[in-house]
Amino acid sequence: MASGGGGCSASERLPPPFPGLEPESEGAVGGSEPEAGDSDTEGEDIFTGAAAVSKPQSPKRIASLLPINSGSKENGIHEEQDQEPQDLFADATVELSLDSTQNNQKKVPAKTLISLPPQEATNSSKPQPSYEELEEEEQEDQFDLTVGITDPEKIGDGMNAYVAYKVTTQTSLPMFRSKHFAVKRRFSDFLGLYEKLSEKHSQNGFIVPPPPEKSLIGMTKVKVGKEDSSSAEFLEKRRAALERYLQRIVNHPTMLQDPDVREFLEKEELPRAVGTQTLSGAGLLKMFNKATDAVSKMTINMNESDIWFEEKLQEVECEEQRLRKLHAVVETLVNHRKELALNTAQFAKSLAMLGSSEDNTALSRALSQLAEVEEKIEQLHQEQANNDFFLLAELLSDYIRLLAIVRAAFDQRMKTWQRWQDAQTTLQKKREAEARLLWANKPDKLQQAKDEIVEWESRVTQYERDFERISTVVRKEVIRFEKEKSRDFRNHVIQYLETLLHSQQQLAKYWEAFLPEAKAIS
């Protein structure tokens, strides 16, 4: 059927007429019915609704005109050498729908295997293409490009101070001017890059990786406070988060080719990013738009025709809730591990003081060495707390934000569907208005009504194409996201287990070395 913006008329899709077809197939088309014994006219009137009628041709001539299905992805007919002409198309199973101005035409079982245009195929009984096969055929998104963020540097004093990060890029891709280059970027530049990419790609269904969240308290400490351990820890956390964010951007094939990304990596100086502050006018407008979108989403009642999207959206929502709970537990673990490290350090100091005041030489030496062991264990606890944070907590935090972006892609698809439905409703109203004008015999307004109908028919076709396109993009993006998520979690969990194993091995070595000292106490 002529839906979905294929724009092709029925005559453009019709194959040549086929001789030797049975009379009852001709009658189903709605053309003129020939005499029962008139074998010379068979096949001439099978497509009377077409723009032109071809002369009868021999079966061999027809077979030479049509593409042959040789097992490739091209559509065609299966030609068998020893098969009779009347059985030439016996294996065909797809029905060909012919659109015509006559509403009483019926579907005729086609004798050829004909592929409908993409927009029409979505509305036919033909099954959706296997995106699992598409996933296997796609090449891995591997690019010879590595980005690193180092050397956070505080520039300026007071509340006007900011931190600049060195962004280093190494690549052999020809789209860049050199193979190795470095630039200085501040945090607002990273936020500005995300805003540009999100504005261009999110509306098309792409999953744009989000930057790390702002931290007003942490940045205020850096600006007005002295360089202490808490400020250094905050800067290291932000540096690592920005590096992960930028690496996800350049790993995405669509984002990497964006000129804003290349400019961010190469250009020495960038224009100051505006609207990235939370309390700015643009920031307040974004908050208002988010609230408006949330309300409008509640009013959309989408008739989901593809169960895949419904199931995936439920999976994403459930996974986001579970990750939030797990992230809260891991943060508690990090805090307890840090508290354990502090208490172990206090314990080591107390043991050292006790050993220095002990009269028994062997006991004093054993207590002093036990204090040294506890100091080493305190370092192990501190390192493991950092591993808990950077390998687990930050990974979970990243994917909580990423899942929110995935949900936003589904919401964008829903908004595109709603726009299509609204256009269909408007088109129906325009047609009803035209009918009323015809009934009221008002020819002066009739032409304007016809023009409006043509305009809205074009909009409906375009919006349907947009919906089909964003559905394809969202499906591909979700498949790609799941592959990346599995790879990230596997790598981080393995690395985390290796740190735990190393920590326990070191702990065992410390106690094995101390055991002879304890036994030597007399």
From Swiss-Prot:
It is a peripheral membrane protein. Its main location: membrane. Residues 302-522 form the BAR domain. One of its GO terms (cellular component) is cytosol. A 1,2-diacyl-sn-glycero-3-phospho-(1D-myo-inositol-3-phosphate) binds at residues 186, 188, 214, 238. SUPFAM superfamilies: BAR/IMD domain-like (SSF103657), PX domain (SSF64268). Residues 1-142 are annotated as: Disordered. One of its GO terms (biological process) is intracellular protein transport. Gene3D superfamilies: Arfaptin homology (AH) domain/BAR domain (1.20.1270.60), Phox-like domain (3.30.1520.10). Residues 35-45, 132-142 have a biased composition (Acidic residues). InterPro entries: AH/BAR_dom_sf, PX_dom, PX_dom_sf, PX_SNX1, SNX1_BAR, Sorting_nexin_N, Vps5_C. The modification Phosphoserine is found at residues 32, 39, 58, 72, 188, 280. Residues 281-298 are annotated as: Membrane-binding amphipathic helix. Keywords: Acetylation, Cell projection, Endosome, Golgi apparatus, Lipid-binding, Membrane, Phosphoprotein, Protein transport, Transport. Pfam families: PX, Sorting_nexin, Vps5. The modification Phosphothreonine is found at residues 41, 48. It comes from the Eukaryota. It is found in: Endosome membrane; Golgi apparatus, trans-Golgi network membrane; Early endosome membrane; Cell projection, Lamellipodium. Involved in several stages of intracellular trafficking. Interacts with membranes containing phosphatidylinositol 3-phosphate (PtdIns(3P)) or phosphatidylinositol 3,5-bisphosphate (PtdIns(3,5)P2). Acts in part as component of the retromer membrane-deforming SNX-BAR subcomplex. The SNX-BAR retromer mediates retrograde transport of cargo proteins from endosomes to the trans-Golgi network (TGN) and is involved in endosome-to-plasma membrane transport for cargo protein recycling. Predominantly forms heterodimers with BAR domain-containing sorting nexins SNX5, SNX6 and SNX32; can self-associate to form homodimers. The heterodimers are proposed to self-assemble into helical arrays on the membrane to stabilize and expand local membrane curvature underlying endosomal tubule formation. Belongs to the sorting nexin family. Binds phosphatidylinositol 3-phosphate (PtdIns-(3)P) and phosphatidylinositol 3,5-bisphosphate (PtdIns-(3,5)P2) in liposome-based assays. Can bind PtdIns(3,4,5)P3 in protein:lipid overlay assays, but not in liposome-based assays. This is Sorting nexin-1. It comes from Bos taurus (Bovine).
